[in-house]
Amino acid sequence: MNILELSEQEIQRRANLESLKELGIAAYPAAEYPTDAFSTEILESFSDDAPQRTVVIAGRMMSRRVMGKASFMELQDSKGRIQVYVNRDAICPGEDKTLYNNVFKKLLDLGDFVGVKGFVFRTQTGEISVHAEELTLLSKSLKPLPVVKEKDGQVFDSFEDPELRYRQRYVDLIVNKGVKDIFLKRATVLRTMRQILDENGYTEVETPTLQSIAGGATARPFTTHFNALNIEMYMRIATELYLKRLIVGGFEGVYEIGKNFRNEGMDRTHNPEFTCMELYVQYKDYNWMMTFTEQLLEKICIAVNGSTESVVDGQTISFKAPYRRLPILEAIKEKTGFDLEGKDEAEIREVCKKLELEIDDTMGKGKLIDEIFGEFCEGSFIQPTFITDYPVEMSPLTKMHRSKPGLTERFELMVNGKELANAYSELNDPIDQEERFVEQMKLADKGDDEAMIIDHDFLRALQYGMPPTSGIGIGIDRLVMLMTGHMTIQEVLLFPQMKPEKKIPKDSVEKFVELGLSAEIVPVLNKCGYNLVSDLAKSKAQKIQQQIGEVIKKYKLEIEKPSVAELEEILLKVES
């Protein structure tokens, strides 16, 4: 890396690294450093009456206060933080005090990883600390961390810009309290979910991520090219059709927790790459699945929060069963006053116009109903609510309702104004399923790029016979948002999708060289703010030379600066 691309702190840290090497101290040792304690456990278990305890801990140095022969530092490990007392004569019992005077005081930097062996004690101010007897450098940090300070409950200099936090999640995790807890809770959600599903006898499986047909949902897929077979492939938008094949094959119940990909928009509740759990169980229907889902979410909430309640944006949401069950057409009637039962596509279009919804000719009956529900109903369901009995046009993979013509046995679980889960009594009639696929293809012909493609192999599987089955898909990211009280999906994803970083426009070195400048002087010009050849025209030769000289002096560069006359000649070329 060019030294001119580094900050003064980064340059100093690299100088410290070289000094450590000269002292024979490995900045990145290869050997294991066995620890036997964590910060939180030490703080929780300490007793003034107990025998003195020696511990070995390791972590990142987050602060340091040097007071002559004695110092304090704050060590952050994977569990929390603890104060370490560092006394010169304790870590340097002999004549050589280099480890304290040079290494600890001058060559270590905030962010460095160190190992400490010492005994636990309570300071005169009452703080439980570790009295260091041995100090070992474990890893040198070359970039300074943002220094987040806290006083009287107020946070200063916080690392809070959302874009920076999401791009540099590693820094976010280090310096911002509570961020790591989000992802520990996410792990609890997944662990609890797996435990419950496994205890019920269901088998976790893995199905293809690369698929020849993007089936199982209505969404726009990501495409890629499979070179070995010379065919177009799709990143899966759902796991549904492969999991149903396994039910055909004889599994009692199967589930998969994995990534799905939908080539659609990004916002506070959508990420194109998202985690979903899909479950399929034979001999069950959507009524059974509603009851099972209530029990599942109630247990997950207790595991994460210690109760059946979670607070999101000031709203207390109760996951205690049972949840309200409301047919979708009744929900629309309740929220808009329009009764859509028995209405055809043309009549529903008229309702959309009266509601001043933006619609187009590609939208079929199902899409129109979906638009009405999404605009006027969805956001109003804060407490968990099962929206049931969707029209067949909205549900191409769902069994027809046993007693309501034109409707299907499907539910979506709404929580905090968003869909959390989608479930069916699964369609297992292969003839009916083929007819539904054909209807979807008609929508595709009209321009609906989210319509389903016919999956002939799935139809073949159904022809061998699939038992009555219920299935559900639960969005894990949204579930974690609800369990942790966050309003944006990016907060619960370790590395959310982001737009490319903005980069300062910069001309190539060759463009500057063509003017007669040396290649080695170009980074100096960039440091002075001349990133484009055209930038030179905004200044005078004498000023440019002065700026170059200042950079060369500051960074002790052994390069020759161009003369004023040479720069004037170059400026003439730029202006011409």
How would you label these PLM feature ranges?
Residues 1-504:
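Class II aminoacyl-tRNA synthetase catalytic cores and aaRS-like
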Residues 500-576:
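Compact, charge-rich alpha-helical regulatory domains located at protein termini
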